[in-house]
Design a protein with these regions (language model features):
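Short acidic, glycine-rich surface-loop motifs adjacent to enzyme active sites
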Residues: 194-202
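Protease zymogen maturation seam
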Residues: 17, 21-86, 94-104, 132
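Subtilisin-like serine protease catalytic core
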Residues: 63, 73-188, 200
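Short linear motifs at secondary-structure transitions and domain/linker junctions
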Residues: 4-8, 56-66, 148-154
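Generic alpha-helical hydrophobic packing signal
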Residues: 33, 172-174, 196
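Aromatic/histidine-rich interaction motifs
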Residues: 1-15, 35
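Short, acidic/polar
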Residues: 15-19, 189-193
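Hydrophobic C-terminal alpha-helix "anchor/cap" residues
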Residues: 19-23, 154, 197
């Protein structure tokens, strides 16, 4: 439109005052803020689309209460996570070979996978994805299932034709096994996992 104008303001209060002043001046037919919009970051993963993951988006499916969810689509408008963020999952380990998790795993830059050496000299051999504090090894493979489910809720891969999607699908997962196959945890093992996480940037 030829007679339109765009003004800018540095802060929200200044913008609000300017808008109110322009609206009451009778000089303009319409005065509106110039808002930023973006395409929604809604993944195409099956369980999200069909409502099975009702905790992420509840539209009342299966007799549920519409809106009784975590509001994840609003969060995704802000961020889907960052590959620079490492989330330490201190649990029963992670099945890091899972098709929705393999690409999401943090990788220890100081370790060479499969060479049976403690390359980074931290006391754990081949701790590529994290550690197993239960057995004091570098293999945090889940033998219970709980840690894998938690990891999937956090960062299951998106838009990959698989059914699941995580809340922050762009972060990296560090697998820290403090719980055994029966789901029992020792506080010393949890502490060791916390130390490893902090030491390695989680």
């Amino acid at each position: 439109v030829d007679d339109s104008r765009v003004a800018s303001s540095l802060d929200a209060e200044g913008l609000r005052q300017r808008l109110n002043g322009l609206r009451t001046s009778d000089l303009f037919s319409f005065v509106e803020p110039n808002r930023v919009g973006r395409i929604a970051s809604v993944p195409n993963d099956g369980y999200f689309q069909d409502g099975t993951l009702w905790g992420l988006r509840n539209a009342g499916q299966n007799g549920g209460t519409p809106g009784a969810d975590i509001g994840v689509t609003n969060a995704w408008d802000i961020t889907i996570g960052s590959t620079n963020v490492i989330v330490a999952v201190i649990d029963t380990g992670i099945r890091y070979t899972h098709s929705d998790l393999a690409s999401q795993m943090w990788r220890n830059p100081g370790e060479t996978a499969g060479d049976n050496q403690d390359n980074d000299k931290n006391g754990f051999v081949d701790d590529v994805f994290g550690i197993n504090a239960v057995n004091n090894t570098g293999d945090p493979l889940d033998d219970n299932g709980h840690g894998t489910r938690v990891a999937g809720i956090i960062a299951s891969a998106a838009n990959n034709g698989r059914p699941h999607v995580g809340v922050a699908w762009n972060v990296r997962l560090m697998a820290l096994k403090a719980g055994n196959s029966a789901g029992q945890f020792l506080s010393a093992d949890v502490a060791q996992c916390v130390y490893y996480a902090v030491t390695n940037g989680a």
